[in-house]
Amino acid sequence: MRKSFLSILLLCSIATYAQEATSDNGGQLIKNHSFEEEAKPIRNRRFGPNGEGELFGGYLPSGIIPGWIGANSEGAVSQMETTTKKLLNKEQCQSLCWSITEATPTSPAGIANVGHNGIEAIKGNKYTLTFWVRADKRYKGRLHVGLQSKLSDGTWYAQTIVKGKIKKRWKKYTVTFVAEGDAENARFVITADTPGTLYIDEVSLYSPVATKR
C-alpha cells in the first residue's frame, strides 16, 4: 500500500516538473496545462458557478485549480474540479472535470486560464492550441476557444470554433486562431453551449511572436 502511494506521488511530481519545464523553456502560454499542479490523491477542489471558492458538500472551499477560473456568461451555470477517473493515460494523475448545468449558444458556460502573468494578445499574431477532451453522452454542443479580456466587458481578441463532434473517448484537437486586437493581459477561454460534462487535459497554447517577448 505504501509502495503504491509513493509511486503515485512520484508520478505526480514528475508530471508537475515536466509541466513547469515546458513553461520555462518551450514557450507554453497556459499555466497548469495538464492540471497536475498541487496534485493530490483525492479530489478536493471545486469551483463555484463563476469561479468563486464556494463550499460544496465536503469539498475544500479553495476553488484552487492553479491557473484556471470560471468564466460563465450571465445565465450559464457550471463548475469544475480535478478528477482521477478515466484519465488520458497512465502518466497523468488527474484531469479536469467540467460539469455544465445551464448553457446555450447565446449564454455559454466558460472556463479560463490566466497564463503565467496574463496572456499577451498581439494583433495579427497566430496562436496554435492543442488539447485533449472527451464528453459524456449528454453533451451535444460545440466548443469555442480564444483570447478574451480579463475585464467584465468580455471583449474577444481572438475566437474560433473547435471543428468536429466532441466524443465519449479522448480525442486530441488542434486549433489555430489569429488575434484581432492587442492586450497585454488577456486570458485563454473555452466556452461550451449545452449542458453536459466535459473532461479536459493537456491544454497547450503557443505563439512564436508572443513567446519571444
Residue ranges of predicted features:
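Sec-dependent N-terminal signal peptides
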Residues: 4-13
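Extracellular and organelle-lumenal recognition/adhesion modules and their flexible linkers in secreted
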Residues: 19-213
